[in-house]
């Protein structure tokens, strides 16, 4: 499978893609460059597909890639419920995209970045 090097070493590239994938799962929208967005989209599509499968092997594969960060904090009665990015993927996003066969993300173009004129885009999850 071909991939973009993005001007980084393999470890740096993998860390950046993991971070962007996790950020998109948590926030459901990120602003980044066009080439990064096109590369991150591949990983997000795979993670949501794993979430739709929902078995133990899929959970372990997703847990190995998605960062362990807090996605949401809710207060119910006197309890504080903390939801991780992985829980959000399997509990919220997977049921939302259950009827959709791929194409979970959308790329919207923005104006160029002021400093270096890089093409900027908004990468978001489709409703």
UniProtKB/Swiss-Prot annotation:
Signal peptide start-end: none
Keywords: Ribonucleoprotein, Ribosomal protein
InterPro entries: Ribosomal_bL17, Ribosomal_bL17_CS, Ribosomal_bL17_sf
GO biological process: translation
GO cellular component, one term: cytosolic large ribosomal subunit
A single GO molecular function term of this UniProt record: structural constituent of ribosome
Pfam assignment, any one: Ribosomal_L17
Gene3D superfamilies associated with the record: Ribosomal protein L17 (3.90.1030.10)
PANTHER family per UniProt: LARGE RIBOSOMAL SUBUNIT PROTEIN BL17M (PTHR14413:SF16), RIBOSOMAL PROTEIN L17 (PTHR14413)
NCBIfam families: L17 (TIGR00059)
Quaternary context: Part of the 50S ribosomal subunit. Contacts protein L32.
Family: Belongs to the bacterial ribosomal protein bL17 family.
Annotated HAMAP family: Ribosomal_bL17 (MF_01368)
Protein name as it appears in the record: Large ribosomal subunit protein bL17
Organism annotation: Ligilactobacillus salivarius (strain UCC118)
